[in-house]
Amino acid sequence: MDSPCQPQALNQALPQLPGSVSESLESSRARMGVESYLPCPLLPAYHRPGASGEASAGNGTPRTTATATTTTASPLREGFGGQDGGELWPLQSEGAAALVTKECQRLAAQGARPEAPKRKWAKDGGDAPSPSKRPWARQENQEAKGESGMGCDSGASNSSSSSSNTTSSSGEASARLREEVQPSAPERLALDYIVPCMRYYGICVKDNFLGAVLGGRVLAEVEALKWGGRLRDGQLVSQRAIPPRSIRGDQIAWVEGHEPGCRSIGALMAHVDAVIRHCAGRLGNYVINGRTKAMVACYPGNGLGYVRHVDNPHGDGRCITCIYYLNQNWDVKVHGGLLQIFPEGRPVVANIEPLFDRLLIFWSDRRNPHEVKPAYATRYAITVWYFDAKERAAARDKYQLASGQKGVQVPVSQPTTPT
């Protein structure tokens, strides 16, 4: 019998949603993210501090290379922080519940896929209403029945033009209703996949985020920044005796997306903004009203990485970290550069390969200490942090924030709190 303290595999715990944010997702595909893999009773129990419930993935092989291992992390260094707010600080031991249960293992061994939960949103978690249950479906059926009955009872007295007008009118009404109710692709991605993943795991991996064409343009702009000498060594807030390059080995540039030669980076940020905007109001008590500039980072491939750290251990306002990777044909066994996340209170390590067109999202606070393993090839990433309004306002009153943390206002339409 396995020990409950034994590290568990996370390779099935981060299921992937097919398709990219730039393409329209069918309802059946949009639903394939988290729900198809999670046991029904477990999803709402996530993210209650000190909760004893556990969670895992059921049957199915997710389309991701994010895995978990028992790899021992490099020791956490105390008292250092990056200019981007990456702080190295002792971690709290308390956290959310463990990730895997024996019941889930039993289901997986039997090849059983749990039935998708059908719940409304809940304050302590929950899931989105199934997009396949369209609010307009009943009206369409009623309209179809009405049209059919009209054709049977009217006889010769009803003209074909009247029937045609009625059908046309009802069709236009249905089309308008679809347009009003049907969520956009970023909205479906946010509600059906990112929000449940963040509530349940605190980590979300989305492949094929932009698509090969736009992703390739972003990569070209980042490479131009590097070869144009625009990148500078990443800095540390705390200046100690230890050389900064022994803590972090990346070169960075802060980009708004409006600069010449950075339009595609701006388009990337617009896509990420759109997804996060639809998450607003559904991720705990956070009120997301802005973000940092985009931090373009390059590890030059000389064996440097970034030691284990927490992005926001002291409440500087950042609540969500989004990282977009740009590394084509990347092989971590050859090139290194693996990102490892150590979810607080869970006996797992999430290994995230920095693959091209992959978007990684995770909580910025002490729940997700992480590190970048030494990279032996040029490794590119773009990172942005989203602010919680209340914490950010408090941080402004307390601290003089580093220049790289000056926020960019992002218009966020706060959705109505789901019921």
Swiss-Prot record:
Residues 237-247 are annotated as: Beta(2)beta(3) 'finger-like' loop. Disruption phenotype: Null mice exhibit a lowering of oxygen consumption in skeletal muscle. Glucose oxidation is reduced to around 35%. Hypoxia tolerance is induced in myofibers. It holds the Pfam family 2OG-FeII_Oxy_3. Residues 1-18, 64-73, 154-174 have a biased composition (Low complexity). Its cofactor is Fe(2+); L-ascorbate. Residues 115-126 have a biased composition (Basic and acidic residues). Keywords: Dioxygenase, Iron, Metal-binding, Nucleus, Oxidoreductase, Phosphoprotein, Ubl conjugation, Vitamin C. Residues 290-388 form the Fe2OG dioxygenase domain. Highly expressed in testis, expression was also detected in the heart brain, liver kidney and lung. Expression was lowest in spleen and skeletal muscle. Constitutively expressed during differentiation of C2C12 skeletal myocytes. Residues 1-89, 108-181 are annotated as: Disordered. SMART domains: P4Hc (SM00702). A motif (Bipartite nuclear localization signal) lies at residues 89-134. One of its GO terms (molecular function) is ferrous iron binding. Ubiquitinated by SIAH1 and/or SIAH2 in response to the unfolded protein response (UPR), leading to its degradation. The modification Phosphoserine is found at S130. The Beta(2)beta(3) 'finger-like' loop domain is important for substrate (HIFs' CODD/NODD) selectivity. Interacts with E3 ligase SIAH2. Interacts with LIMD1, WTIP and AJUBA. This is Prolyl hydroxylase EGLN2. It comes from Mus musculus (Mouse). The gene is Egln2.
